[in-house]
Amino acid sequence: MNSICFDTETTGLHPNGSDPDEILTISIIGRDGSVLLDERFRPTVKTEWPHASAVNGIYPEDVADLPTIETAIPRLREIFAGADEVIGYNVGFDLGFLSAVGVRPREDARITDTMKEFTWFMGKRKRYKLVDAADHIGYEWTGRAHGSLADALATLAVQRWLEQWLVAE
């Protein structure tokens, strides 16, 4: 099975509408942790995103001279077309942003939401942040939390931990 794990950082929470938020960075890794794509983009609509910047640390000047996501769409489509499984933390959020730019997983791809699986494991009805799930499993961060590559690696670690736990049961 060809599995990928990915994360995005965005200008906000809403990929659709008259003033849509946009993807600033996307990182995609294979199940073995190899980096398939790790890119930043200049938004085409938004000129500032102070609330998102406070979380993800990406400011307009950081991406002002970068290409737009349009340059990466062929590669994104290729990666998602080859994936039998797509893993993410609150994956619907990220998939919504990809869908807004015309990138979707295959219809027969398994969509694995590590946040939902971790919440089920914990037996609670609240949403666990990725940093909390990673802390719970003793994950040591490589990079800054809320960076797309660091978050993709942490998501994969939590997913692997959950799968090992399920096998042990």
Question: What are these model-derived regions, one by one?
Answer:
Residues I111-R127:
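Short, flexible loop segments at boundaries between secondary-structure elements
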Residues E85, T112-K116, W161-A168:
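Short secondary-structure transition/capping segments
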Residues M1, H136, L153-E169:
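Acidic two-metal-ion nuclease catalytic site recognized across multiple nuclease folds
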Residues M1-D108, G123-K124, V131-H146:
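Conserved non-catalytic scaffold segment of RNase H-like nuclease domains
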Residues A150:
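Acidic donor-binding loop at a coil-to-helix junction in glycosyltransferase catalytic cores
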